[in-house]
Structure formats: C-alpha cells, structure tokens
Amino acid sequence: MISLFYIFATSLTKMQLLNILNHRLYLMHSIHRRVIMPVPTLKHFINGQYIESKGSEYFDLVSPVTGESYARSPNATVADVDDAYASAKEAFKIWGRSTPSARQQALLALADTVEKNAERLIESQSRNTGQLKHLIASEEIATSVDHIRFFAGAARFLEGKATAEYLSDMTSSIRREPLGVVGQVTPWNYPLMMAVWKIAPALAAGNTVVLKPSDTTPESTLLLAELSAPFFPAGTFNVVLGNASAGSLVVSHKTPAMVSITGSVRAGLQVASSAAANLTRAHLELGGKAPVVIFADADVDKAVEIIVTAGYFNAGQDCTAASRVLVHESVYDIFVTKLVAAAKATRFGDPEDKEALYGPLNNVRQLEQVTGFLARLPAHARIETGGRQADRSGYYFEPTVITGLEQEDEMIQTEIFGPVITVQKFLTEQDAIEKANDVKYGLASSVWTRDHGRALRLSRELDFGTVWINTHIPLTAEAPHGGFKNSGYGKDLSAYGFDEYTRIKHVMSSND
C-alpha cells in the first residue's frame, strides 16, 4: 500500500519536501528535549557557595500560575544544618569583630548589587510566587534596597547609657555587642523583602546568619545570598532549604544565640517552644487580623479605595491586610455598596499583567485553606461578591466581600490570608474598640475619621502594634513593625529592629 505521505510528497518540489522533513526532525528533537530535559535541582548556600544536600529527600516546586512543577528542592538534613551553623560560627570570628563602617560599606554594596540585579530577582521570585512582576519591582525590590541602606546606616549609630562614675571611684560604661550566630525562618508571601528584614539588621549589628526560606519560595533568597557573597566573609549569610522539618532543625539547634521567624501563629508557637528548651532568645512576627474602623465622618470613597488595595494586594497574603472592616451603622449601607463595586472591578492576573492588583495564592495548601473558610461559612453570613476559586488554571481566587458575620464567627476570629474582606457594623466608639480588640492577634489596625481627638483615643485603645489613621498598610524603614498578643513579640525595621540583634554589656572599672 502506498502511504499517504508518499503520495503527498511526490506532489512537492524537492525544496518543499526538504523543508517539511527538517521541520519534522526539529519537532521530534524538541519533543525529545522536553521529555529528557532534567528538572533543575536547587542547592543550599553554605560558606559562600552552593552546596548539594547531604540527604536524599527532595520535593517539587510548583508554579502557582499553572499548578505544574518546575524544579526540585532538597530538604535539609541534620548534617546540612550543622554545616551551615559551623560556617556561620567560624565567620562570626571575623564579621563580629568588623568595624561599624566596614559593615556599612558591605551592606551598601549589597544594596547596589540588588538594585542592579533587579530583573534576576524579579524572575526568580515571580516563578516561585506567581506575584505580579511590576509590583515585585516597585514594592519589594525598591523597598528591600531602601531597607538594606537604612540598616547600613544603623550599623554606625549605636546608643547606650552615658559613661559615668555612678559609684564613687568606679567608672561604668555600656557595650552594645552582636549576639553571635542567628537562626532565621522566612515566609512565602514576600520572600525577598522578608529575608532582607531578617538579614539586614542582623548583619549590620555584626551577627552571622543561617536562614531557611519557605519551602515554596526559596529562589530569590538563594540569589540574595549569592549576590551578598563578594562583600562578606564566607559563611556570614547561609541559606538552607527545606520544609517545616528543616525549619525545626534551624530553630532548635544549640548554636544560635537568637532565632527569628516571620510566619503563622502555629509556627511561632513551635519556634518559641524550641527556643525555650535551649533558653535561646526568640523574635516572632506572626499572623494578624487587622481591624479597619470606619466612623460616620470618614471619607468613605477614600476608605474604600485604600481598603480594596490593602485588602487584596498580594492576594490578601499579608499579615497586615485590611481584612476585617468595622463600619458605623449610619454609613454601613453606602460603604458596603461602594466596597462591593470596587471589589468587582478589582483585576487579578498572571505575572506579566501590568493592570492587575494581585496574582494567585501561593500554593495549593493556601488555596484549600481559603476555600475551606468559605465552605464553613455560617448561614447568617452573606457573600456579597466573589467567594470562589477563579475559573482558570492556577491558584487564583476571586476578590471577595462577606457581610453578616458575628463577632465569634471563625472568619472574624481567624486569619484567612486570602483576598477576602469581611464587613461588620458597630454602634458606638466603645463598641468599635471592643470588637476591634476582640481577637487573639495584635499586629496592625487602622482608624478612619476626621475627628482628631477620636483618632488619638483610638490609637491609645487599640491593642495593635501599628495604628494607621486614614490610611492602611504603608511601612517605612524608620518605624518599627511588630505586634502584641498572638502576633508575637520583637520588632522588625527601625532602630528598634536593629536593637533586637544586639546585647548589652556593663563594664565597670575601678579608678584606683
């Protein structure tokens, strides 16, 4: 039997046939390459270089945009973590004795290098998180560079009690010293910026670091460590990869003088317990459930505009997100109408979408958590808009507004970490204060009013580490960030954040 391809081929010119055959060979080669091309495997960054894991356990990194795996990451072993801490301990002998000006110069060089390598960092982080590239550039790269430069300056500004003779013939002075080696764990919502919040004050104070990034978003942190290598002694900044078991190895190790985590309340409790077993200092920045209190005299249009941005930015995956709105009954209806309209107009999209406000949720576990909250919604609650996974590939969730919830309901009391905003009524100022404070969290809050006295009263009464007035979510390197209650303790950013990574020593000398 004569094949159809033979009949087709005989009707073509020699050149046409050659082009077709070449194209078929190209396609076969491309398919073959796709099949056999190995998936990239990440390595730890220890002692100034990439190091293969000593273990055999690996897991897939999965794109939040497509749901497909694209790389493999090792799960750090005891030996890996021991090596990282040994390197950090050795590096501290050099870095811990460096001058403040030397630390400043190293950090300034790192900031410049991060700025120059912005595109590489954006690509690596977007691949891990699905975040919008234009917002990584404006909200993480630029901010991280600024924060590194701030702590470079802080390295040279050490404060303490004045040297004096507080006892007769005795002179007392105060030394502010680095702690030593610090163990750190960072989350997946802002991988680069959270790593900078940890390492910049630690390095500025003269400490060395072993850091474990989130298991789903390690690449921008690895690249940050690589970029830092030329400016610091080998072993100053080490990165070990892995899941919660690797994090447990980092925070329970006997070497660090302090352990620091940004993460969930559950993770923070585990870290605090591990640290307590070794009497290790702990620094915890944990979850939040920020109340947004809207009084009758507030600028409702401005409030809606900012709440939508602060509530849905990064798909609501922010501990300070404007997720729990309390509105005076007199403006409740108009506020809800405008908020729902703004939510419906909010655009989400893939990393290249420059018009979108947010991308997908970071991982399938987080998607299941958010959908689980909606599945358990009580009958008296109402979904005004959204409330479901978007009809597309990846872990996208629609912008959601929910009303009718009662104070004791799960969605009022528990951090959702998704693009979900709840709205409640309040009757009086005292009612607003009581409802705002009636959660286990204490990280951030905001008050919306034109009454200056009321704003000051609320800033005093609200039991949260940050109180914004007529805005929500901006942060600056010069001001502290940290919470109360189950949101943890210790401060990031500012001179207070720098002090977290130092210790105070009293030196008294006889004048005889």
Where are these regions (language model features)?
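Glycine-rich loop-to-alpha-helix module at the N-terminal edge of alpha/beta enzyme cores
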Residues: E68-L158
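Hydrophobic face of amphipathic alpha-helices that form TPR/SEL1-like repeat modules
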Residues: I20-L21, Y26-V65
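Rossmann-like NAD(P) dinucleotide-binding subdomain of oxidoreductase/dehydrogenase enzymes
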Residues: G160-K302, F426
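Residue-level signal for inorganic ion chemistry
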Residues: G67, R103, Q125, I148, ...
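Short, well-ordered beta-strand elements within core beta-sheets of diverse protein domains
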Residues: Y70-A76, A91-R97, Q184, V292-F295, ...
